[in-house]
């Protein structure tokens, strides 16, 4: 039985592609290109750091990834330029169905689980007016590790005092779903871009194009 819903935040509740607008302010005509490269470099950096056990706070890796992209593409930048782009992580666009779905699921506990720090998460949730829908926020920056480290999911169940199979873990990121599924959570992959789930050994329990699809799942709990 599902007792709690755990949400990833970036790409799941908020559109990470909206960063192109913040990058566009600083680099007119190049915002989309920079934002896309930044996103992939950030994911790569986090995964490599996890593999070699060299933790660095998410907020710092965020800046490192952006600076790398700008250097590689020969863009000049100042500290203010970096801050303007990074500030976009606190102002991302919320996906259109999120507020309605969270309100409808008001009778089940919901938690945010993210690599970011609490300040970044709080600011993002408040600007979208959805901060009151969550029972708790578990920011991994305070624990010195990233998803998809198996120990991060142990922290989650210890904090929430639930069993693995009582958690419904929701993410749009495939690597996040694979790790959570292998740990023992029930998982729902939000396939917003209609892509293939190529990890044949591990499959999510549920797959939907948006959060609306989870309505039928929760009816059964």
Specify the residue positions occupied by each region the protein language model found.
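A metal-dependent, Asp-based hydrolase signature
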Residues: 46-83
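An amphipathic alpha-helix signature
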Residues: 20, 35, 39, 59-67, ...
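Short glycine/proline-enriched coil/turn segments at helix->beta-strand junctions
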Residues: 29, 71, 105-109, 185
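Active-site neighborhood of HAD-like aspartate-dependent phosphohydrolases
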Residues: 1-43
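Alpha-helix C-terminal capping segments
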Residues: 23-27, 101-107, 218
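Substrate-recognition element of Asp-dependent hydrolases with the DxDx(T/V) motif
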Residues: 80-91, 98-127, 137-140
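Asp-based, Mg2+/Mn2+-dependent phosphohydrolase catalytic module
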Residues: 1-5, 118, 122-221
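Short, surface-exposed acidic
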Residues: 29-37, 73-83, 132, 164
């Amino acid at each position: 039985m599902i007792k709690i819903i755990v949400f990833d935040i970036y790409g799941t509740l908020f559109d990470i592609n909206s960063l192109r607008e913040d990058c566009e302010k600083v680099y007119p005509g190049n915002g989309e290109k920079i934002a896309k490269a930044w996103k992939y470099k950030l994911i790569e950096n986090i995964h490599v750091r996890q593999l070699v056990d060299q933790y660095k706070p998410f907020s710092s890796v965020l800046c490192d990834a952006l600076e790398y992209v700008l250097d590689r593409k020969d863009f000049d930048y100042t500290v203010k330029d970096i801050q303007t782009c990074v500030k976009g992580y606190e102002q991302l666009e919320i996906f259109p169905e999120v507020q309605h779905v969270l309100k409808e699921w008001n009778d089940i506990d919901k938690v945010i689980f993210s690599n970011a720090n609490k300040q970044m998460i709080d600011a993002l949730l408040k600007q979208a007016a959805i901060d009151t829908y969550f029972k708790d926020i578990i920011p991994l920056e305070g624990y010195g590790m990233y998803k998809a480290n198996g120990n991060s999911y142990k922290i989650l169940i210890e904090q929430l005092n639930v069993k693995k199979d009582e958690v419904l873990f929701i993410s749009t990121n495939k690597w996040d779903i694979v790790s959570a599924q292998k740990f023992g959570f029930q998982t729902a992959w939000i396939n917003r871009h209609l892509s293939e789930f190529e990890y044949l050994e591990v499959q999510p329990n549920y797959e939907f194009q948006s959060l609306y699809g989870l309505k039928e799942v929760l009816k059964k709990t």
